[in-house]
From Swiss-Prot:
GO terms for cellular component: cell division site; cytoplasm. One of its GO terms (biological process) is division septum assembly. It is found in: Cytoplasm. HAMAP family: ZapD. Pfam families: ZapD. Its main location: cytoplasm. Cell division factor that enhances FtsZ-ring assembly. Directly interacts with FtsZ and promotes bundling of FtsZ protofilaments, with a reduction in FtsZ GTPase activity. This is Cell division protein ZapD.
């Protein structure tokens, strides 16, 4: 199952904090990949994603949760540094990165405020819930903006994305460390079902073979989880009695 072209990776949060972080990561990646707003389709994807990110950021104490996790990861690394044979220089480097990200995040303005106060995002956001509500006659300001020189548009977008850098950088190092905290291990499901103890984990990672065309339906929390494998073709697809897959409980 090591051939990545023949497998697919799924991730599932085991608590609300991780759910929020994965959503933020997804939205930040979408903003980065659609930063070249040279047509209406890319522009609407960018502004719709920015609107979604504003909503996610308003739902909780994002900065506080990230700062707590940055501190927790530093403490975990300190414990690793005391283990014989550990690459102390690597541990120290990671700890310094965590401290640096925490300092930048702590001193940053309110996260997402630049998006919320941006007039163009605000105007577009009001029309997103209306079917077809982003036509040029609905949003003449966007229509004019898209016809500005690309240098002006890029400057506008780069400024918005730069305001999100403290969030993006902190989130990236946190999720990287969590994902690397546990390797994928081979498992077997029986009759499409698998369950186990979560042991206080934050994240499940599953790698499945593409060939059976299956997807996981996961339920769980920090103490226990259950996985049911279902066929993509609900009418004609089948689930093997024994399915080999890889799992990490991070």
């Amino acid at each position: 199952m090591s051939d990545l072209t023949s497998t697919i990776l799924f991730e599932h949060p085991l608590n609300e904090k991780m759910r929020t972080w994965l959503r933020m990561e997804f939205l930040l990646q979408q903003l980065e990949s659609h930063r070249s707003l040279d047509n209406i389709a890319n522009a609407l994807t960018f502004f719709r994603t920015a609107s979604d990110l504003i909503d996610v950021l308003e739902r909780g104490e994002v900065r506080t949760d990230l700062l707590k996790e940055l501190e927790r990861q530093q403490q975990k690394l300190q414990q690793w540094a005391d283990i014989p044979g550990v690459d102390v220089s690597l541990v120290d480097s990671l700890r310094n990165q965590l401290k640096s990200r925490a300092a930048v995040l702590m001193s940053a303005p309110r996260i997402g405020q630049s998006l919320k106060e941006d007039r163009l995002i605000s105007v577009v956001r009001q029309r997103l819930s209306i079917p077809g509500g982003c036509c040029s006659f609905d949003l003449p300001t966007l229509h004019v903006w898209l016809h500005q020189p690309s240098e002006q548009r890029d400057q506008h977008i780069n400024k918005l994305l730069a305001s999100l850098a403290p969030l993006h950088q902190s989130l990236t190092i946190i999720l990287d460390l969590i994902r690397q905290s546990c390797p994928l291990r081979s498992q077997i499901s029986l009759n499409g079902f698998f369950q186990d103890n979560a042991g206080g984990a934050d994240l499940l990672r599953l790698r499945l073979p593409l060939d059976p065309q299956l997807y996981p339906q996961i339920s769980g929390h920090k103490t226990r989880y259950a996985i049911r494998f279902l066929a993509l073709d609900s009418e004609n697809g089948t689930v093997p009695a024994r399915l080999s897959f890889e799992l990490a409980c991070c």
